[in-house]
Design a protein with these regions (language model features):
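Pyridoxal 5′-phosphate
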Residues: 1-377
Length: 377
């Protein structure tokens, strides 16, 4: 099988990631739930992983890295915990439902007002629209770093400067960029960075988290056992305990720790360069196929994602043919980004997404081009 669905999850992990998960399953106790060696072993690895994530993302305090099951949970914690009834939020048309649905819920239940920076037919935005949409009651900007459909990226430094100038919270969804694009919370004025571990970070599924700038108070979305301050009726105030009720996924975090070592040794820039070389090769070949429509802006910084359609064929049909006849795994449909499909004019047809990863090869990119050529003729 040729796996080109890395934007959904990286199927091939560094071998040390798998080894670390297996080792942890045989040796870890429950972090912060005892002083015996097995519990302490889990605690040490979890803290070490916080430190590595803080260094990767430019978060000043490792204890402000809180673990979750994925970026969806992290975004729910950030959005529900930071935005209050009646406030106004600016977002964009590029957003995943992990951002949109929490915002829509607040709109329905808490009278939160929403404005969206529109996307054009290439999936780009006009950054001047942030100023245009600003209101006296604006509380936050919530946006993605990279589109999971087109691969287009947003200029976080530009948006962060706008948010900082107007004293707004800046919450970022880094699901598609963490581990493949440089992120610096301080330089980009990011208040809360939400990430998942199983995509470009190449860690296990069931891992993710949020990095919180010092001074940003998030009301806990869930509360419960913490292993400390048992007699408090409320969730403890200190981070990361405030946002980590219940047992952490220590086994998964051990795998994420090993993945972060691999990223450090290999280099985020090296990984991104490899993936982009494959994308450029793929796009150049696809552009020569009559009847294929590509979506997105391929002239600016982006991730290694290409979305396309063949004539008026349903995207699901194309993806099924690729899988069943050619052994190529892709992602069809709406990709949980309804507003962006509306902007691109693909809400009925959807799109077939090809997403390249570290373990893909030129031969696999060429095979995908050849398959599309046959399907299109």
């Amino acid at each position: 099988m040729i796996y080109l669905d890395n934007a959904a999850t990286t199927l091939r992990k560094p071998p040390q990631v798998i080894d670390a998960v297996v080792a942890a399953m045989g040796s870890f106790g429950n972090s912060a739930r005892g002083t015996h060696e097995e519990a302490l072993a889990a605690s040490r690895v979890i803290y070490d992983t916080r430190c590595k994530l803080a260094a990767l993302f430019g978060c000043k305090r490792p204890d402000h890295v809180a673990f979750t099951c994925n970026s969806t949970e992290a975004l729910n914690i950030a959005i529900h915990g930071c935005i209050h009834a009646g406030e106004h939020v600016i977002s964009t048309d590029l957003e995943h439902n992990s951002v949109l649905r929490p915002l829509y819920r607040l709109e329905r239940e808490n009278n939160v007002k929403l404005s969206f920076v529109p996307a054009d037919r290439q999936g780009n935005i006009d950054y001047a629209d942030f100023e245009r949409l600003l209101r006296p009651d604006t509380r936050a900007v919530v946006c993605t770093h990279a589109s999971n459909l087109t691969g287009n990226t947003l200029d976080l430094a530009c948006i962060g400067a706008f948010a900082h100038e107007h004293d707004l919270l800046f919450i970022v969804d880094a699901s598609q960029s963490a581990g493949v694009l440089p992120i610096d919370m301080e330089q980009m004025h990011i208040d809360v960075l939400c990430f998942t571990g199983h995509k470009s970070l190449m860690g296990p599924q069931g891992t993710g988290g949020l990095c919180v700038r010092e001074g940003v108070d998030i009301n806990p979305w869930k509360v419960g056992g913490t292993g400390v301050q048992t007699y408090l009726h409320e969730q403890p105030e200190q981070m990361p305990t405030r946002l980590e009720a219940g047992t952490l996924n220590g086994h998964g975090i051990a795998g994420l720790n090993a993945a972060l070592d691999f990223l450090q040794e290999t280099g985020v820039e090296t990984i991104h360069a490899h993936e982009m070389a494959l994308l450029r090769r793929f796009v150049a070949g696809v552009k020569k196929i009559p009847g294929v429509a590509l979506y997105g802006d391929f002239d600016h910084e982006r991730t290694a994602v290409a979305a396309l359609n063949i004539g008026d064929m349903d995207s699901g049909e194309v993806s099924d043919i690729l899988s069943e006849d050619y052994g190529i795994a892709t992602r069809p449909g709406a990709h949980c980004v309804p507003r962006l499909h509306e902007a691109l004019g693909t809400e009925e047809q959807g799109a077939v997404r090809f997403s390249f990863g570290w373990y893909n090869t030129e031969e696999e990119a060429d095979a995908a081009i050849a398959a599309l050529r046959e399907i299109a003729t």
